Amino acid sequence: YDRICDHAGGRLITNNNGDVICTLHKWQFNPERGTYNSDNVKKETLEYKEIEDHFEVNLSEELIDLPKFTTNKEIEIKFLNHASLLVSTPDFKFATDPWLTGQAFSTGWWLKYKSPMGWEEDLNSCDFIYISHTHPDHLHPETLSYVNKSMPILIADFASQSSENYLNSLGFNNLIKLKHEETLINHKKEIFFSVLKSGDFRDDSGLLLKYGNFSALFNVDSNYLNYFKLPEQLTMVASSFAGGAGSYPVCFENINEKQKSIGQ
């Protein structure tokens, strides 16, 4: 096995008692069973060859090879809210993870910013919407209630079908499902999309875009995305979106301004 913890990408070490634990969240790994004690998650074994008195392990570090598109394309990227961006080009238009109204996590999270006027029209004018995973601040039922049910939705094809099942229950059936590192490509218009899996056991994903000579990675909140096997040079990386989304301290009225400042 490798030393990467499948929970959050931490490092597995052997402590003084001989237990294999993660340095981040103390998950304990049982190498005899190949599972973690914290959850019923099985760790994949490494590919190896036994050569005389040693083992040779296959640790592929191949990076994703983006198409060598060179045309300077027109592209506009607009921040809508939280993890939602609106990407507009002459050839296509899409939005990511739209949470643009209401609350999430049973009123535990609220939007930090006011969504721009006309966001409903923005969403419905898209060619498709990308949704990374099923957390309610990414797959947000109230926001999606404003979207035409025929809208194509791009999702990762998780083995659990978590995104597919949730969207189907909301009335969305025009789903574009991409497996890990599967691509959509149009060589003539120099358009490339690929959905990447998070590097842990959870259902989460990111989106890789190449449009002409412009490239972007929408990491969203995926942990250890594609095991960090990513293109070396990107025009833009979109991540670290969630600051300030919680209700504390901005929604609390029973604490003074000094206490709110300390809370932040």
Label every PLM stretch briefly.
Residues 1-14, 91-130, 141-146, 224-232:
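Pre-active-site segment of Zn-dependent metallo-hydrolases
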Residues 155, 227-264:
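Cap/insert and terminal regions of metallo-dependent hydrolase folds
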Residues 34-38, 140-150, 165:
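Metal-dependent catalytic neighborhoods of phosphoester/phosphodiester hydrolases
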Residues 40-73, 155-213:
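Metallo-beta-lactamase
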Residues 29-30, 102-103, 134-139, 161-163, ...:
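Active-site environment of divalent metal-dependent phosphoester hydrolases
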Residues 1-63, 140:
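Rieske [2Fe-2S] iron-sulfur-binding domain
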Residues 69-119, 203-220, 236:
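Conserved beta-strand hairpin/beta-sheet module of binuclear metal-dependent hydrolase folds
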Residues 3, 25-27, 83, 98-100, ...:
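Active-site metal-binding loops of divalent metal-dependent hydrolases
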